[in-house]
């Protein structure tokens, strides 16, 4: 009988670790499950690349944990961050700019630039609002300082910041998934979440995969 990945994992190795998550979620089916639970139906993942390197010869290059592409050619960037030693939102801003430079061919109109999705999963609630999920919306502020949602100011960038510090505790699939990412154990797999778990993890049973 083959050993399972749980028997081979270093102590305290969980899916929040980018080392582990990039191995698991480069599997298209696992990534599809992740995207479906977080973004909802309607996003068919057609390809996945882990550790996607965007090289810049003059300025800082970036390496994305997971970059998926949908049937609608919309990039979905998934990032896992344990530490709080940098500015997460500015990191996403820089990643977005780097992705954009590879999306629009010369001669194309800006309106042809596809939507891009950022799913940024952190250990801590760095925003500090006491919420599990933060979705960023662009809005308008007038000269009196009043914010209005009356005007459509979307630019095609979708940002979701999800933390593992504040549990949802609502029994939803997302609740199960986040608990499983935080504590990736066989016990939690059985109690919490199935589709992204054992089936895909068993494909990476030996230490050399990590």
List each model region and its residues.
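Elongated, amphipathic alpha-helical interaction scaffolds
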Residues: 1-204
């Amino acid at each position: 009988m083959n050993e399972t990945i749980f028997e081979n994992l270093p102590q305290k190795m969980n899916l929040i670790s980018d080392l582990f998550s990039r191995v698991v979620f480069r599997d298209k089916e696992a990534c599809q499950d992740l995207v479906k639970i977080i973004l909802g139906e309607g996003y068919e993942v057609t390809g996945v690349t882990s550790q996607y390197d965007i090289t810049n010869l003059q300025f800082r290059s970036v390496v994305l944990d997971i970059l998926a592409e949908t049937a609608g050619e919309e990039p979905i960037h998934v990032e896992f961050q344990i530490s709080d030693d940098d500015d997460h939102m500015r990191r996403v801003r820089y990643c977005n700019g780097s992705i954009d430079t590879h999306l629009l061919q010369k001669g194309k109109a800006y309106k042809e630039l596809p939507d891009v999705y950022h799913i940024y999963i952190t250990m801590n609630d760095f925003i500090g609002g006491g919420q599990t999920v933060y979705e960023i919306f662009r809005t308008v502020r007038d000269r009196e300082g009043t914010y209005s949602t009356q005007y459509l100011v979307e630019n095609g960038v979708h940002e979701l910041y999800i933390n593992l510090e504040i549990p949802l505790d609502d029994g939803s699939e997302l609740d199960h998934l986040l608990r499983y990412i935080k504590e990736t154990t066989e016990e939690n797999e059985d109690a919490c979440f199935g589709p992204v778990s054992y089936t895909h993890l068993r494909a990476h049973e030996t230490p050399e995969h990590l």
